[in-house]
């Protein structure tokens, strides 16, 4: 192969490379949504532990106010440009033949053990999750069974401004609590009480 033949084909070989470089560029690209959005519960089974007292790592303000949030989520889009209203209802039939992992039957959280802020959750514009506040009453904390995973609040989405994701339209929300003295304690010979290896459950909002 002579020198002139090689020089003749160098521009032809370089052309695809130049086209590749000019076709690739950085920048923001917008991708279309799926065409519709849906609402759902992220978890169908959930244990919410109300942790009373203080924690240096976790904000327990809601816990000490005996409150927690029941949340729904939206999917199918890259953003939420409006408030999405989700109506729900407590559905005791969701607990039919339901048991915890150890075989203990789930017990419906008595209606006098809690107060719902309403029967509608709102996912605010700009957010993909929103909920309603649940306030636990003194009756809940007076029940010794509440310190164990016993009671469940079964909730089902009944209507929404968007479609409802099938199979994730409900959640079984188990509620329990730990008081500030929960844990393993030892007493020294002089009568002093020392806390050792406390049982700690991370608070989840």
Positions of predicted regions on the chain:
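Bacterial N-terminal signal peptides that target proteins for export
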Residues: 1-11
């Amino acid at each position: 192969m002579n020198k002139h033949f090689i020089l003749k084909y160098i521009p032809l070989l370089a052309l695809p490379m130049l086209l590749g470089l000019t076709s690739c560029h950085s920048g923001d690209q917008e991708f279309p949504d799926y065409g519709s959005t849906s609402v759902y519960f992220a978890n169908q089974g959930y244990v919410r532990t109300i942790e009373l007292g203080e924690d240096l790592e976790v904000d327990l303000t809601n816990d000490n106010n005996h409150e927690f949030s029941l949340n729904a989520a939206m999917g199918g889009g890259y953003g939420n440009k409006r408030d999405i209203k989700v109506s729900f209802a407590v559905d005791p039939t969701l607990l039919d033949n339901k048991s915890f992992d150890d075989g203990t039957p789930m017990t419906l959280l008595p209606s006098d053990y809690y107060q719902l802020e309403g029967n509608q959750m709102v996912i605010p514009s700009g957010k993909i999750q929103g909920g309603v506040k649940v306030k636990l009453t003194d009756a809940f904390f007076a029940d010794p069974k509440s310190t164990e995973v016993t009671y469940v609040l079964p909730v089902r989405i009944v209507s929404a401004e968007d479609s409802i994701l099938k199979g994730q339209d409900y959640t079984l929300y188990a509620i329990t609590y730990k008081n500030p003295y929960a844990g393993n304690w030892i007493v020294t010979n002089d009568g002093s009480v020392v806390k050792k290896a406390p049982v700690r459950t991370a608070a989840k909002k």
